[in-house]
C-alpha cells in the first residue's frame, strides 16, 4: 500500500470509529451554565450533573459555572460579569441551552436568628427577572435552582419554595425543586445525612441529590440508574480547581444512591403535575 492510499485508509478508519454504530443515534448534548455560590461549587455540582448524565441514556449535559462564595444574584447582576462569563470561549459562538440561577440560601434576605424567618424576597425576584432577560437575549433558557432550608430551621422551605415557584411561573422558567427533594429525604431517611457540619452546605450525598434533581428537571428523564460513584474536577473552599487529575466527588452505597435517585424523580414528577 503506497503512502497516499495508506493515509486515505487511516482517514476512513478514523471517520468510521467516530461515527455512531448502525442502528444507534448520536446522543444529544445539553450545554448548561450554573450561576450562584458555594451551593453550586461544593462537591462540584456541575461536575456531578455531567458525570451522572454520562452514564444514563438521555442527553449528555456539558457544564460550566460562574460562582462566588456567599454571592447573591443581585451581586452577580451588578458586577456585570455574567455576559462575558457566558461567552467562555472568548467569542460570540458559545451558546447555552440552560443557564441555572441559584440565589443565596436565605433568598437574599435577613434571617431572624431566633425563628429562622426569612424576609421579603423582593431583591431575589428583581434579580432573577433581570438575569433571565440577559439569559434569553443570549439565546438560552433560564432555570432556577431551588435551595433547601437550613437544618436548624426546616420551616424555611415554605418561603423558599414559594419564592422560587412564584418567580418561575412568572418567567415560565423550569424550577429544579432540590429543596423539596431534600425535605422528602430528611423525612423518610433521617439517618441519611445531606449536610456538612454547618447545617447549611451540602455534603456529597446532598450534592448528589441536587444533581439528580437537576438532571431530571433539565432533561425530563429519570436519574434512576445513575452511577453511585462520580469522578470529576476537584474543588476546594474557593470553588473548582484547575486540574488534569479527576477526583472522586461522591461515593455512595448502591442502596443510598438508588433512594436519592428515586426521590429526585418522584419530586420532579410531582412538581410538574401541579
Per-segment meaning from a language model:
Residues 1-5:
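N-terminal secretory signal peptides that target proteins for export/translocation
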Residues 7-18:
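Bacterial N-terminal signal peptides
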Residues 28-33, 140-142:
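Short, surface-exposed connector motifs at secondary-structure boundaries
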Residues 30-33, 39-123, 270:
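Conserved SGNH/GDSL esterase-like catalytic core that processes O-acyl groups on lipids
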Residues 42, 204-211:
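Short alpha-helical patches at coil-to-helix transitions and adjacent helical residues
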Residues 88-207, 216-225:
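Alpha-helical cap/lid subdomain in secreted, periplasmic
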